């Protein structure tokens, strides 16, 4: 009866024997009204639209038209439940320091600039919350509610976001509902993550959201910055340990946890086969859910072809379900305990070796000289600048993308492997390393990814780039570690050369290498010219050549 009262003139012309068709026409009109923002006819939420679809479905089922009820109509219901009216949720993200500086600015100058002009960044932060509120008002809370805090250091960072969200609006009823997601990125932050979360759940706004969502909570882990901060070996082990501790903490508080993995793309950014990454997760950290970022440089490779896209999604979904099986969880738990001592020793040695390189006097300018780091920063590509715009100019403020890509351009790929060779050499027990490779998914995935990175390095060409820096001591550290890591990885996997037993990938790299070699040599010549230029016109011409080869 309620449906029939909504019939438009067009639907009313349809025979009463085609009631379902008439109702669907009404729904189509209401969808158009929703797009046009016609308040009288529009759907005010996707839930109302889904309710209408289910009414039609029940009616068809009761009429014994089950093929119609549970065929394409069921697909439409699933699509509506999955995508809503907004298609894809908009997630927001900002650095914790930006929030704290915005609050300091407001306290000093007043919310409306009563005691002086607010900084442009403060206006941008407040406008971000207003944009979030506008999206929610138009498309519902599911369209935009997650707010990620990069470089979360303490629970105060979470409080800052809730305070700014309130300050952005004049009327309390306009303040949008948000779920604040801490992002732990650096080694120290990963180690302190549980302490921060313990304080976080004491915040009233967080408690209210936990109650409203049935205890759902999301925590994000950063693979890129942790790798740049601690080195690939220590970052891998620290992330695994953090996930394990966070999962246990969530279980103890009856929290329905989703871990959001900021990984993908290059191996130095946590990349590699996604399905194997899922299977290597610690017990309790998946529970049939796995959320991760897809980096821009791999989106087309994974989703550009529908067949490949379906295969990739199916592979990750299968791994997610398999990893949640009790037998797999038990295996991962047992292997983590069995090789804990080995992991600890590798971690310490690799971390020390990595820090020794980074702390060598003059490393930062040398790195800028022997790689196209500066030129990458000048390219008008990418969604973010090469360095974080927080005023500092140290290596710490260099974003991970140019850090990793610069080493890749120099055919060194240092960000993926540096320190492991020394760690294995000091550990010395090849049998245990081989056994761990066979039994422990985390270690085997890590070693296989490093072997792939080593297959893409070229010592001959790397030496040409390193010669640009005139630092034999640093060159020796890099080349010695490259050789040592290659030796130990090949021993562990039982290969005579990288990717010997992964024929397809190995052949693909070998076919591509001659073409990349030519580009690399040309780029080295351009960089050599750039490093010597003083005249502005000549410098500009050399830069243009460098951009072309990049």
Language-model-derived ranges and their functions:
Residues 4-181, 185:
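Structured, charged N-terminal subsegments at the starts of enzyme catalytic cores
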Residues 86, 91-93, 98-100, 110-117, ...:
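Acidic, glycine-enriched catalytic cores built around paired aspartates
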Residues 156-159, 191-192, 268-271, 508-516:
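Short, solvent-exposed polar/charged micro-motifs at secondary-structure junctions
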């Amino acid at each position: 009866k309620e449906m029939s009262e909504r019939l438009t003139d067009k639907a009313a012309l349809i025979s009463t024997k085609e009631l379902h068709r008439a109702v669907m026409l009404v729904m189509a009109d209401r969808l158009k009204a929703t797009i046009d923002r016609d308040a009288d006819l529009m759907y005010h939420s996707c839930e109302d639209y889904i309710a209408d679809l289910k009414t039609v479905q029940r009616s068809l089922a009761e009429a014994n038209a089950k093929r119609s009820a549970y065929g394409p109509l069921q697909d439409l219901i699933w699509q509506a439940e999955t995508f809503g009216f907004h298609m894809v949720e908009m997630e927001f993200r900002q650095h914790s320091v930006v929030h704290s500086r915005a609050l300091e600015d407001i306290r000093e100058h007043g919310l409306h600039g009563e005691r002086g002009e607010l900084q442009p960044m403060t206006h941008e932060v407040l406008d971000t919350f207003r944009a979030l509120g506008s999206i929610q008002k138009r498309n519902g809370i599911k369209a935009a509610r997650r707010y990620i805090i990069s470089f979360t250091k303490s629970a105060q960072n979470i409080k800052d976001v809730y305070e700014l969200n309130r300050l952005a609006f004049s009327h309390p009823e306009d303040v949008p509902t948000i779920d604040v997601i801490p992002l732990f990125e650096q080694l120290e932050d990963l180690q302190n993550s549980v302490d921060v979360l313990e304080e976080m759940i004491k915040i009233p706004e967080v408690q209210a959201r936990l109650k409203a969502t049935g205890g759902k909570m999301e925590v994000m882990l950063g693979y890129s910055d942790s790798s740049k901060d601690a080195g690939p070996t220590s970052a891998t082990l620290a992330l695994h340990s953090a996930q394990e501790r966070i999962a246990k903490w969530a279980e103890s508080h009856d929290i329905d946890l989703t871990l959001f993995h900021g990984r993908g793309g290059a191996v130095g950014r946590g990349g590699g086969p996604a399905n194997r990454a899922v299977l290597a997760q610690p017990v309790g950290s998946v529970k049939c859910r796995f959320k991760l970022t897809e980096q821009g440089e791999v989106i087309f490779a994974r989703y550009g072809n529908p067949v490949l896209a379906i295969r990739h999604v199916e592979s990750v979904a299968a791994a997610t379900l398999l990893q949640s099986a009790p037998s797999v969880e038990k295996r991962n738990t047992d292997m983590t305990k069995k090789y804990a001592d080995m992991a600890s020793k590798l971690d310490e040695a690799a971390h020390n070796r990595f820090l020794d390189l980074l702390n060598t006097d003059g490393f930062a300018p040398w790195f800028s000289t022997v790689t196209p780091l500066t030129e990458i920063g000048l390219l008008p590509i990418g969604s973010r600048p090469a360095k974080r715009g927080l005023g500092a100019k140290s290596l710490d403020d260099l974003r991970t993308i140019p850090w990793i890509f610069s080493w890749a351009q120099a055919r060194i790929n240092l960000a993926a492997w540096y320190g492991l060779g020394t760690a294995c050499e000091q550990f010395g027990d090849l049998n245990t390393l081989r056994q761990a490779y066979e039994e422990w998914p985390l270690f085997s995935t890590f070693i296989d990814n490093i072997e792939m990175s080593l297959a893409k390095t070229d010592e001959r060409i790397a030496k040409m780039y390193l010669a640009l820096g005139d630092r034999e001591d640093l060159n020796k550290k890099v080349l010695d570690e490259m050789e040592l890591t290659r030796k130990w990885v090949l021993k562990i996997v039982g290969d005579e050369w990288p990717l010997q037993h992964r024929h397809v990938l190995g052949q693909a790299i070998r076919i591509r290498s001659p073409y990349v070699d030519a580009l690399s040599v040309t780029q080295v010549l351009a960089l050599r010219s750039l490093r010597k230029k003083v005249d502005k016109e000549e410098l500009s011409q050399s830069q243009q050549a460098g951009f072309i080869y990049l």
